[in-house]
Amino acid sequence: MRGRLGTSIVCILVFSISLSAESMASDSIDEAEERGFKVVRTIPLEETSFTQGLEVRNGSIFQSSGLYGSSRLTEIDLQSGNIIRNMPVNDSYFAEGITVLDQSIIMLTWKGEQAFRIDISNFSIVENFSFEGEGWGICFNGEFLVMSNGTSQISFRDPETFEINHTIQVTWDGQPVPNINELEC
C-alpha cells in the first residue's frame, strides 16, 4: 500500500509527469524535463487525511482522502485552511486521484473499478463510470482524461463516456516503469 507521511501540504507539486503534445507525438524521450519548486506556505490538514488526489481551483483546495471506511472528498479554503465541506465516500470504496473537469470533479476509486463525476458546486455524484483494473492518478489535458492504474500504462479516456481512446506505455531505457501514480497535465 502506498503510504503518505505528514499532515501538512508542503508543496502541491512534488513530482509530475508532463504530457505535452510534443512529447506524445514522439515514440521516445531521451531526457525528462527537470522542474523545481518553491514552498510558498504550508496548510495543516486533518490527522486522518490520507491524501490521494489534490487540485487547486478558484481559491479552494480539493482533496481526495482514501482508506476503506473513511474515504472522502474535501474542499479547503486556500487562504485560511478551513474546511468548507466534506463528502464521505461509500465505505466499500477507497478514494484515489481527482481532477477538475469543467464544473465537476472526476474521482477514481482504487480497486472499486468506479469513477465518479461530482458536481463541484454541491458535491453530489451526478454520474458514475465503470472501468477495469485499479484507479490511481488522473488529470485532464484539455482533450482527454489521462489515467494511471499503478502499472506502466497510461490511458487516455473520453471525458464524456470514460471510454479508452488510446494508451501509452511509460518506459525508461526501453524498460517499463511500474507504479505510475500522480499525473499533472
Where are these regions (language model features)?
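Beta-strand-rich domains and repeat architectures in extracellular enzymes and scaffolds
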Residues: 40-72, 88, 92-99
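Blade-loop segments of beta-propeller domains
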Residues: 81-117, 125-135
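Short loop/turn segments that connect beta-strands within beta-propeller blades
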Residues: 77-81, 119-123, 159-162
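Surface loop/turn motifs at the tips and blade-to-blade linkers of beta-strand repeat domains
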Residues: 42-47, 87-91, 127-132, 169-175
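Repeated scaffold domains used in trafficking and secretory/extracellular systems
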Residues: 49-53, 93-99, 133-140, 177-182
